[in-house]
Structures are given as C-alpha cells and as structure tokens.
Amino acid sequence: MKGMNMKARGLFLLLACLALMGGGMPRQNVFRLSGMVVDTEGRGIGGVVVNDGVGFALTGADGRWALVTDTFRSKFVSISTPAGFRLPQDSGLAAGFFVPVGRAVAGGGWRFVLERRPVAADSFYYVAVSDPQVRNASDVARWRGEAVASLRSTVAALSRSREVVGVALGDLVFDDMGLFDDYAGSVAGMPMTMFQCIGNHDFDRRLPALRHAPEGAPAYAEMAYHRRFGPTDYSFNIGRVHIVTMCNIDYRGGGRYAELLSDSQLSWLERDLSYVPRGSLVILNMHAPGWNREGAAANIDNAPRLERALSGYRVHVFCGHTHFFQNVEVGDSLYQHNIGAASGAWWSGDVNRCGAPNGYMVAAVDGDSISWRYVASDRSADSRMRVWAPGTFAGHEGFVVANVWDYDSRCRVEWMQGGRPMGGMERFVGVDRGPSPRGAGAAAVPTSHLFRCRPRPGGGRVTVVVTDRFGGRSYGEVLADGTVRLWSGRG
C-alpha cells in the first residue's frame, strides 16, 4: 500500500475486513448463468460469442447460451454483436450488449435482443477520441465548446453517407467519477454509436482495481465506470471488421498503476480472436500505447506478448494516454495510432505536447481496408501541419520548419522554392516551438514529426508539400513577408 494516503488505506482495510467477515456466512459466488440471444421477432440467433470476461460460450442454433461464472472475478456477461445486427445503443451510447452478473443471477438468466441489419455495413466511419480528461467546470466547458462541438459537426456530416461508430480512448475524466454523467451527456444524441475505454484517471483513487481487491470486496476502483459504461474488455463486429476494447491499466490505488495487460486478459483476447477468421481486419482500442519510440516509458510492459496474440490478423491499434501524436508501424500487419488528445496538454492550451492540435481521428473503413485523417477541433479538418518561416523556430533560424503530426513512412514531405521542386525536407527530432502548453506537467516533449529545409535568400516563396499514404496533399506556403498560408487538395 506504499503511496496510499491514510484515508485511502483505512477504506481499503475496511473493505478487506467486510469481504473476509461476510457476516459470518459463506457467500455463494459461482453460478451457472444462462439465457438467449434473439432478434426483435424473438427468434434465436445462433453462433453469437458470449463471455463473462473469463469463460466463453457460443450460442446454439436456438440462440441459447450458458456459462459457469465466478461473480467475484466476473462482473458482466457480454456478447460480441455479430456483423449482421445493429450495434445496440441508448441515446447514442453503446448499451444492451452486456448485463451485470448480479442482474443475470437475480433474473435467473438474461435475454439479449438484437436488431437485424437490412443491409451489411461494409463501409462505415470510425471516430477515435483520446483523453477528454475533464476535472472541473472549466474543462467541461472547453470539452463541450471545442471538441464536442467539432465532433457533432463532423459526425453529422459523416452520418449522411455511412454509419458512424465512435470510441473514447480513456481518461474520460480526471479522477472525478462524478463527471462521468457530464461526459456521457456531452456525447449522447449524436448520430453514431459511442463506445468507451477506461483510462488511468477513470479509476477511483481510493481503491485498488478489482483484480487487486480482496476476494468478494463490495467496492473496487473501476466500479463507478462499470456502473456507467459497462465492461472494460469487450468486442463487437461491424462489416468485415472485428473491434476489441481492452483495459491496459493495472490500477493499484492511490494513483499508482502499471501499463500492462494481465495474463488472464491476454488469454481472453486470444479466445476472443479464435472466433475471428485469420487475416481479418481487427481494430484494438486501449488507453496506453504499446510501441512508442519517443516517450516509450508510457508503453505497456508486455507488448511482445500482445503482438504475438495479434499475429495472423491485420491490426490497427488506437490509443491515447501520452498527450502527444505518434504513428508506429510495428510490423507489416500491425499499425499503432497514438493519437493527439482532445484535451491537448490537459486543457492548458490548444496543442498537445508535441505541437499537434487538440483533436480526434476519423477513419474510413471500406470492406477490409482503412484510411484515416486527424481532425483539429479548432481548425480545418484538412489542416495536417504547421509551418514556420525562417527565423521563427528557435534553434533553426535559417530554416523553414514544418510539424507534420500524422507522419508515417509512406508520407512524403517535400518543398519547392519559386515554383521549382527542391526535393525532400530533412526530418529531425526536436521540440515544437509553436504555442506551448502551459502549466506544471504540461511541458512540450521531443517529437520526430518535424521537418526542415534551408531556402535560398531571394529565391522566391517556399511551398511545403505533404503527400499522405492515401494520396491526399496539404500545402504550406511561406510568403516573402513571412506570412504562412495553409491549404489542402488531392494529388
């Protein structure tokens, strides 16, 4: 309990005593749970994957399922919604795909009801938002007025052509569980189905997580999150894609945690993926990254084991936690998007610690292919870079410098002077010199998505041309008076 304050320690010991005493009577904790998965006409749906976080079952042709569940270890039974059915939701928030085990026990089982899709959703949009991390009324106002306002506009436009699915990648709040309802209310009512992932600041600091609590403890750190949003490890299917969300924060209480997936979680993931055809496109959502090259201290401890569990699939990992932007091509079939935070550097300014603007990611899925673009909350969705004129980026005074936050190895960053192509810009590691985040703990960090070129004095205007892996082009032009103009187009 090192690091826990006296109040938290006292509460922890009280819960431990209550769990051990149990009123002097042993409590039954293992039950055979059963039920059905049916459509809106009451017909059983066969082949649906059901799990309680430990054990798995597949519904029979009649839609029936059964699991033997230890309610001390498992808090939910959930289904992996099949692609042929709509994602269940309530006012835009994902719901209806899980049931608390206590309710299933009290009700003698549970019936999940799914609505059949009239047509397959092989093409859809996927919106990933990282770290809203609101801690007070001021943060909530900025979250609603900036990120949510932008999200509502973006989602409204996207939903006119395709279904939209969203995920918040953890740290919905900043240690104040009372703000969960504010977060939920802010994203409700949009024309999309919004899922959640738990982050380290979504745990109750006074308690350890369930896996570290005394057996049968009446309270644990993720209980408030469970009550509001459901399980922390779950999956679903849409179109030809399998989507998994997992908690990779091992929370010990008092703000202490490790970034990792437990052995039992990795076994759960392997079981979940065993029902998915090899070679499928898989999206994995988690809070902390696995493979960052800068800021690697925030990576999960057992990333190699996770990589092995994901082998055989084409995987895109979406994560947050770091408050900077970094793409990592882990392998030919594994790509990590550590996206910029919606809160930037904890609402201390308008940028993340790497200089990327506060924003979110929009991915377009077509069959088994995926493309993506980052959307800045306060600027054009097509703005993919920031550009500095010579003399305005400290330490590189003779250079034009560009920060290209969504850069990866298949992106080209080139420049022209006076309309003449000059080749590729030089990539370097440095600290963004733009509008810096303010406040303790929000300091800028080195990033490798910076580029520079040295123009010839009097050689005419300089144009930076960024071509992404999908052929989209963005331009930054430095005029003679040092003014910078940005715009986007196609290749």
Residue ranges and their predicted role:
Residues 25-32, 41, 86-180, 460:
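N-terminal active-site segment of His-dependent metallophosphoesterases
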Residues 31-34, 39-54:
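Short, ordered, surface-exposed loop/turn motifs in non-cytosolic proteins
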Residues 35, 59-73, 112, 421, ...:
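Glycine-centered loop-to-beta-strand initiation motif
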Residues 48-52, 77, 413-415:
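Hydrophobic beta-strand segments
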Residues 54-68, 426-433:
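Short, acidic Ser/Thr/Gly-rich low-complexity loop/linker segments typical of extracellular
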Residues 83-90, 95-102, 177-278, 297-318, ...:
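Extended active-site neighborhood of metal-dependent phosphoesterases/phosphodiesterases
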Residues 334-407, 411-417, 448-479:
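Binuclear metal-dependent phosphoesterase catalytic core
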Residues 431-454:
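Aromatic sugar-binding surface patches on proteins
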